[in-house]
């Protein structure tokens, strides 16, 4: 059967607030108030069954509408819906890397705390080090790892790998995938001088994990100001 224009538009029209096209708009409006998607930066993508919903590139994220969404077929990687006046997200290859590992939602922010932590780690530990912190209550909001049951505990150490930034977002995919392979239990990857990618099994988990991690990153910056260590060793 051929796909009609009506079928294509039906992909982004729903009264359900949890429909991916609606949900992305709601999330990005919230993320804007947190300073995560300032100045058209950042993005969010949701996998719903065999379809990937992606916020466009170069738009004010707090003003997006469901009709601004791109929709891609997960298997073929072809666009089912592509707004003519908007650009596909430069984050798409990075989002797909998360979805190919079972994620249901991936969030990319330009959080200042994420950027600052990558600089602090580089200054104090070098470019090969990851961010590590322990004995912080909010760590309990982060899963133990892919395929593992439950979340990290208070005495567990949270580790988030850091990759170097590139001139073009899509060029991050190779290093991001390499970090995913090296750190299979991580649900987040920091990008130096840029931001962070966080993903989860579903929208709820990705959102709460991103909130927990940003809280921890802000805390880490404030701890550094006070000369407090992130870990005991």
From Swiss-Prot:
It is an enzyme of class 4 (lyase). GO terms for cellular component: cytoplasm. InterPro entries: Aldolase_II/adducin_N (IPR001303), Aldolase_II/adducin_N_sf (IPR036409), MethylthioRu-1-P_deHdtase_MtnB (IPR017714), Salvage_MtnB_euk (IPR027514). Zn(2+) binds at residues 108, 110, 194. It comes from the Eukaryota. SMART domains: Aldolase_II. One of its GO terms (molecular function) is methylthioribulose 1-phosphate dehydratase activity. Its cofactor is Zn(2+). Its EC number is 4.2.1.109. Pathway: Amino-acid biosynthesis; L-methionine biosynthesis via salvage pathway; L-methionine from S-methyl-5-thio-alpha-D-ribose 1-phosphate: step 2/6. Binds 1 zinc ion per subunit. It catalyses: 5-(methylsulfanyl)-D-ribulose 1-phosphate = 5-methylsulfanyl-2,3-dioxopentyl phosphate + H2O. Gene3D superfamilies: Class II aldolase/adducin N-terminal domain (3.40.225.10). The active site is at 137 (proton donor/acceptor). GO terms for biological process: L-methionine salvage from methylthioadenosine. Substrate binds at residue 91. It is found in: Cytoplasm. Keywords: Amino-acid biosynthesis, Cytoplasm, Lyase, Metal-binding, Methionine biosynthesis, Zinc. HAMAP family: Salvage_MtnB_euk. Belongs to the aldolase class II family. MtnB subfamily. Catalyzes the dehydration of methylthioribulose-1-phosphate (MTRu-1-P) into 2,3-diketo-5-methylthiopentyl-1-phosphate (DK-MTP-1-P). This is Methylthioribulose-1-phosphate dehydratase. It comes from Phaeosphaeria nodorum (strain SN15 / ATCC MYA-4574 / FGSC 10173) (Glume blotch fungus). The lineage of its organism: Eukaryota, Fungi, Dikarya, Ascomycota, Pezizomycotina. The gene is MDE1.
